[in-house]
């Protein structure tokens, strides 16, 4: 029977003096081949339970730790993916980041999360162009409403998945919710409960452009407005100009509050509010409360998100 050789963890040396235990050390100490030791550590291969248990005891005693960098290099992968979003301040994008991280962990991946300056020279196009495949195996890109990507921007030589209601020119895998149908359902929910004069908080469409919404195929705001418009048209419900102010690209709580006040100040009667995201809905609710308007007794409110 071979005598166990002392390692740094057994000699009382300081951490800086400790010798890193290698897979070869484990194999020699256990009296097995490198392949067998590797199979035990990676939970693969066929061997007797006794052999597997013997090797595992050596692993535990020597304090062997997998060299992740070396393993990933051998496998031709980094073990990381990149998630790129316009910002992390909105609940939707923060929630997206959390879900991506949770799912990646199941597959033994870590996630680099980065933001980009949408609509600038350091926007998504720059990020795609300068992606470093030596530190990340691919990218999940949350598409910006403020930046139009060309086919050339999206023609990359690494795995790319785009998220959001923008056209990707069939150059990348693409995940997006059905904004039109979802907005229709939200609007119909209010109409089914007696709302006949709906207001909309979050529109980026001028009133004169409403008739063109049926042709819209991208953009969260435009697609959601299309769903609202179609649902109202089906019920012969008119949308008043004063009840759907153009908020631009600001879908924050503050914007919801300010634009709800604009609607109230217009003096045009309304009995329902369709907010195109939940932050706008929260802002609208605070303004309604500040004006003494009861929800849902006087005005019913619905938001769009989870």
Locate predicted features:
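Short beta-strand-centered segments that line the small-molecule binding cleft or hinge
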Residues: 124-180
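Small-residue (primarily alanine) positions within well-ordered alpha-helices
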Residues: 27-32, 38, 51, 70, ...
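Short acidic active-site motifs
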Residues: 68-69, 123-127, 148-150, 255, ...
């Amino acid at each position: 029977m071979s005598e166990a050789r002392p390692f740094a963890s057994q000699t009382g040396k300081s951490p800086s003096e400790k010798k890193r235990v290698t897979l070869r050390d484990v194999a020699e100490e256990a009296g097995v081949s490198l392949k067998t030791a590797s199979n035990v550590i990676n939970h693969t291969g066929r061997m007797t339970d006794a052999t597997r248990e013997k090797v595992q005891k050596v692993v535990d005693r020597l304090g062997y730790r997998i060299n992740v960098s070396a393993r990933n290099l051998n496998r031709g992968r980094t073990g990381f993916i990149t998630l790129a979003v316009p910002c992390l301040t909105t609940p939707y994008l923060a929630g997206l980041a959390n879900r991506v991280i949770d799912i990646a962990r199941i597959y033994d991946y870590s996630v680099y999360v980065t933001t980009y300056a949408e609509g600038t020279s350091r926007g998504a196009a720059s990020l795609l162009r300068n992606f470093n495949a030596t530190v990340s195996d691919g990218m999940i890109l949350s598409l910006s409403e403020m930046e139009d990507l060309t086919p050339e921007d999206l023609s990359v030589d690494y795995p790319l998945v785009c998220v959001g209601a923008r056209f990707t020119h069939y150059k990348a895998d693409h995940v997006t919710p059905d904004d039109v149908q979802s907005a229709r359902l939200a609007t119909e929910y209010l109409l089914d409960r007696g709302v006949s004069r709906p207001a909309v908080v979050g529109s980026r469409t001028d009133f004169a452009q409403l008739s063109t919404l049926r042709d819209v195929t991208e953009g969260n705001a435009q697609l959601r407005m299309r769903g609202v418009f179609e649902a109202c048209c089906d019920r012969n419900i008119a949308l008043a100009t004063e009840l759907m102010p153009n908020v631009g690209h600001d879908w924050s709580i503050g914007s919801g509050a300010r634009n709800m006040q604009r609607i109230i100040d217009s003096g045009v009667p309304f009995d329902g509010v369709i907010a195109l995201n939940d932050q706008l809905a929260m802002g609208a609710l605070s303004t309604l409360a500040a004006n003494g308007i009861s929800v849902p007794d006087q005005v019913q409110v619905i938001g769009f998100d989870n």
